Amino acid sequence: MSKTPRQGILAAGNFIVDYVKIIDGYPAQDMLASILSESRSNGGGPYNVLKDLAAMKVEFPLAACGLVGDDANGQWIKRDCQNHRIDVSMLHLSQEHPTSYTDAMTVQSTGRRTFFHCRGANAHFDLKHCGFGKTNARILH
């Protein structure tokens, strides 16, 4: 660890792509619902915290620590973090596992949501992915 004073936040854990799908109603099993619209956004506690802090334009460093797949979703997460001044040097890419994602099915008329989740790379995130000696973060979230 360097002698630089500690500053900023390192957020470690789940980095997820949320696919929000607005549907006309939740169907009974074996039935159909229409998807009216869909969007993609960040998901997972650490990712959400970092994005919120970036939106607040905080003046201290923000860093991500996690495991995403070496796929389109993983690249999207890395780009999104970089575009929001979030250091991704500890956001690792897995060759073996896809990026974790959630399909959030949202009923248009009620706002009620049901989630379908692929654990993907997050299920394999471990302490070995965290090089805590390589960070000067003051806070770990």
Where are these regions (language model features)?
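Ribokinase/PfkB-type carbohydrate-kinase core domain
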Residues: 1-20, 67, 75-93, 97, ...
